[in-house]
């Protein structure tokens, strides 16, 4: 029984280039500048790609907090993370920093972002400014497939 996933092999994208990354989850969307004014067709296709692949990646983007929030608002109202203070002018944006002297990573263990809330958000947006050449991994899992595998 398929409970959510779109048949991504049959999804046609006319305005964006979508490259699946793995069989279970994820795709990279290319040739889109998220800080520019995006028309409804492009936004609709980005949303369809999100529904089809559950995690989407956009490389080489240049976001300021204002443009990041503006892009997020195209898909719903951003929430304020309840446990960590966000930026002063953009409380919906939570900076995550790890210094060389820090022993633990933010989140530290496998977790899901705010899905415990009564009305959880549709997703999480992560904008990496600086990442190490090795390590620093953020991992994702497809809970739809995990649920299907139970039966």
Please report, for each region that a protein language model flagged, where it lies by residue.
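Non-heme Fe(II) oxygenase catalytic core, chiefly the N-lobe of the double-stranded beta-helix
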Residues: 2-151
């Amino acid at each position: 029984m398929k409970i959510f996933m779109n048949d991504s092999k049959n999804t046609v994208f006319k305005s964006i280039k979508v490259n699946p990354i793995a069989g279970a989850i994820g795709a990279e969307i290319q040739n889109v500048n998220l800080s520019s004014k995006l028309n409804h067709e492009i936004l609709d296709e980005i949303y369809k790609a999100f529904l089809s692949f559950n995690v989407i990646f956009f490389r080489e983007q240049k976001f300021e907090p204002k443009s990041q929030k503006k892009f997020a608002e195209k898909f719903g109202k951003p929430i304020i993370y309840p446990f960590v203070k966000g930026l002063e002018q953009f409380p919906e944006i939570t900076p995550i920093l790890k210094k060389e002297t820090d022993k633990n990573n933010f989140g530290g263990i496998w977790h899901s972002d705010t899905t415990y809330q009564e009305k959880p958000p549709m997703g999480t947006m992560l904008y990496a400014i600086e990442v190490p050449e090795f390590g620093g991994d953020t991992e994702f899992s497809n809970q739809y497939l995990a649920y299907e595998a139970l039966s």
